[in-house]
């Protein structure tokens, strides 16, 4: 099917035609509707991208779609699902998957992602991203779910590593081994959430650097950064919560620096979903990520020049 035919089909269906904005090497932020006027009036914000939660746009129309359409006309968009329950024990919700696929078709996002987690059981929905045991049975089931999603949306899915607050005795492999197995079986890409790595490493007492060294970086198509909250568990020990309600912590920036030094610039999204600040604050976080990536990219270019010389 030619590009002209695809455009004609979209026009017949009343689907807007959007430009194919590149996302490689860019930093972005969560898109919040209250920021739209400030974004449209911001002459300094010219090169980033925005991420939206798919479930906020599963209605037929109205203000949410009008706002997202304006953003998509000028910027790359990352579509991030939070309710697919890919890690759950039961079949995927076909209606939810169809609505997700319709959004992919409508907005042609640069990036499409979901979580390695579950949120439904029987007819009950839990408003959270819950962990799963890392076993061969779980690996097979999650791989089947990923393959189903990829077949329906017609493109690879990026799968996000979770933040966790407990571990399962039933697990027979590490999280990174489980994720590598999913990549092998499905060909999916990965969304590396560095804040999640730091939160889980702190809560469970393992090395975030060791985790990253074992992570299949060659398959990472997007990075997430976010803020977290420090609490105490029942025994008085430090417990980190992936709260997305404050600036990125220094320790997470340092891990991000390590990853970009190793892999080069990867599309990076700063999440902020609670206690949402004014647009300039969120923009400043994304600009910090962009500056770090640009610095490493400049270093790589300089090294290439030296080698060629």
Swiss-Prot record:
Any Pfam family matching the protein: MbnB_TglH_ChrH
Keywords: Plasmid
Family classification: Belongs to the UPF0276 family.
Protein name as it appears in the record: UPF0276 protein RB0508
Species: Rhizobium meliloti (strain 1021)
């Amino acid at each position: 099917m030619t590009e002209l035919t695809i455009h004609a089909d979209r026009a017949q269906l009343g689907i807007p035609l959007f430009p194919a904005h590149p996302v490689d090497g860019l930093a972005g932020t969560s898109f919040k509707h209250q920021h739209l006027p400030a974004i449209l009036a911001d002459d300094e914000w010219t090169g980033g991208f925005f991420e939206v939660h798919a479930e906020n746009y599963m209605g037929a129309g109205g203000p949410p779609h009008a706002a997202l359409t304006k953003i998509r006309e000028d910027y790359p968009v990352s579509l991030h699902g939070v309710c697919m329950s890919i890690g759950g024990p039961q079949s995927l919700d076909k209606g939810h998957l169809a609505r997700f696929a319709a959004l992919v078709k409508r907005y042609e996002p640069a990036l499409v992602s979901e979580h390695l987690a579950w949120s439904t059981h029987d007819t009950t929905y839990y408003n959270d991203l819950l962990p799963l045991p890392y076993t061969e049975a779980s690996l097979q089931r999650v791989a089947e779910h990923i393959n189903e999603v990829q077949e329906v949306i017609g493109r690879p899915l990026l799968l996000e590593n979770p933040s966790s607050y407990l571990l399962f005795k039933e697990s027979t492999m590490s999280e990174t081994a489980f994720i590598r197995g999913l990549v092998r079986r499905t060909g999916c890409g990965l969304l590396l959430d560095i804040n999640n790595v730091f939160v889980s490493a702190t809560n469970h007492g393992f090395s975030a650097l060791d985790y990253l060294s074992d992570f299949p970086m060659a398959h990472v198509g997007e990075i997430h950064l976010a803020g977290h909250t420090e609490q105490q568990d029942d025994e008085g020990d430090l417990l980190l919560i992936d709260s997305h309600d404050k600036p990125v912590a220094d320790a997470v920036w340092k891990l991000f620096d390590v990853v970009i030094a190793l892999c080069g610039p990867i599309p990076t999204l700063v999440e902020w979903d609670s206690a949402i600040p004014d647009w300039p604050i969120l923009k400043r976080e994304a600009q910090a990520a962009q500056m770090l990536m640009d610095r490493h990219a400049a270093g790589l270019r300089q090294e290439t020049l030296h080698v060629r010389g």
